[in-house]
């Protein structure tokens, strides 16, 4: 029987894909406000969509976010109730929230300790309403 490719230590989590209504607005949010880099972007005219990859490091070493923009999407996406959030580590959650709030970013859960733990966290929303948890890590 062949070796399970997921248990060889060579499998790796590559990216999470989210659909975005306004690619320019999302690119600005993830690059300018959250400090990620645009890693690559490609239009697919025959499928009428664009894929853009953003992250804090190269895809060969880091997990990144794939932003999918369907050109004919006029309405906001229904985010459903299955997806919760993804998390980013920052050295100072309160300062990060202050900076993001000054840019008009919605902060549904301000910086503070977790209810059932000691970590300082906050939740912000991206332009499409996806929740992003900020976790304080020094």
Language-model segment annotations:
Residues 10, 17-62, 102, 115:
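Core segments of cupin and vicinal oxygen chelate
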Residues 1-27, 83-86, 135-138:
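N-terminal beta-strand motif that seeds the catalytic metal site of vicinal oxygen chelate
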Residues 2-9, 12-21, 39-42, 50-57, 63, 75-101, ...:
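Vicinal oxygen chelate
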């Amino acid at each position: 029987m062949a070796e399970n490719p997921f248990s060889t230590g060579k499998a790796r989590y590559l990216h999470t894909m989210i659909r975005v209504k306004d690619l320019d607005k999302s690119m600005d949010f993830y690059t300018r406000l959250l400090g990620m880099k645009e890693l690559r972007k490609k239009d697919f005219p025959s499928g009428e969509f664009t894929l853009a990859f953003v992250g804090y490091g190269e895809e060969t070493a880091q997990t990144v976010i794939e932003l999918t923009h369907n050109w004919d999407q006029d309405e906001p996406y229904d985010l459903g109730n299955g997806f919760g959030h993804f998390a980013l580590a920052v050295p100072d959650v309160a300062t990060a929230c202050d900076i993001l709030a000054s840019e008009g970013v919605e902060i549904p859960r301000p910086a503070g300790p977790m209810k059932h733990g000691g970590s300082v966290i906050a939740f912000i929303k991206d332009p499409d309403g996806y929740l992003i948890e900020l976790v304080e890590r020094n």
